[in-house]
Amino acid sequence: MRNSLVIPSRFCGPPGTGNGGYVCGRIAAYLDGPVTVTLRRPSPLATPMTVERDGAGSIRVLAGSLLIAEAAPSPGSPALRVLGLVSLAEARAVAGRGRYYADPFFPCCFVCGTGRQPGDGLRIFPGPVAGRSLWAAPWTPDPSVVNGSGRVRPEMVWAALDCPSGIAAAEAVGLPEDSAILLGQMTASLAALPAAGDQCRVIAWPDRRDGRKLTAGSALLGPGGQVLAAARAAWLTVPRPVPPPAVPDHPAVPPAAGHPAHTGRLPDPSRQITTQEQQQEEIRP
């Protein structure tokens, strides 16, 4: 059986390509339960892709003849471990204080981009929690990311769990200024979905480094501190795009407004896509 999948331009990550967590969440919707999605190439935006089932419970996503991603259920995976909890006050206190925000390499990103307006991007800006190997950020879902029942759509939860783990992993190893990271693989388990207006927070923690591969975990906490979802991710270090996109000013505590709106007009990604294709092929299930 074949289905069609399109990633709208709003949900970009690196310039001209889909945000990895959002793309993984859209793909995971074709399967039940915890799912592992492996990204083989950057997902194009506003372009129909084909979703193919293999008859054994796995799926492949293709853009023409190019393999974009593979996904499979992860029923045997152990419960995703959450390394500590963070209060909403703690998350607010550290928001935007990560080293990444001194010079973010993807300011147009739907999740962590400083160049996205409230109601357009998720604006999740994690910072390190003092004395703990944890990064945290507050997140209050807006009405644009919920379903008809008022609950956050699952792919938005995947997206929210994506960038914080990458920022935690990159900052923990002291990623050089000439490097960036790209999501290669993500496994997520969703227990409950928050509602629009819920004062949530996202936490993340680094795991380990293996050459150019970094692994990290993340979790979404509800207003009462309950774990709503958790994920683990593998990231690959790549050369930073050259020239880097322009970066707007970003204060220590993210403002409610003041960043330019995302217009959908993005830099030419051709050089970057070639790099991503080469690097993401190294992630294997």
Regions of interest found by a model, annotated:
Residues M1-S4, A56-R151, V253-I273, E281-P285:
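Non-catalytic linker/capping segments at the edges of enzyme domains
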Residues S9-G13, V145-V146:
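Short hinge/gating elements
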Residues F11, P15-G18, V23-T50, D54-G55, ...:
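Hydrophobic beta-strand-centered segment that forms part of the acyl-chain substrate-binding groove
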Residues T36, S58-L62, G217-A219:
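Residue-level detector of beta-strand face positions
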Residues R53-I59, R212-T215:
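A short, compositionally biased
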Residues R123-A191:
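A mid-sequence, solvent-exposed acidic-amphipathic segment
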Residues A180-P254:
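Accessory, usually C-terminal, subdomains that scaffold auxiliary metal cofactors
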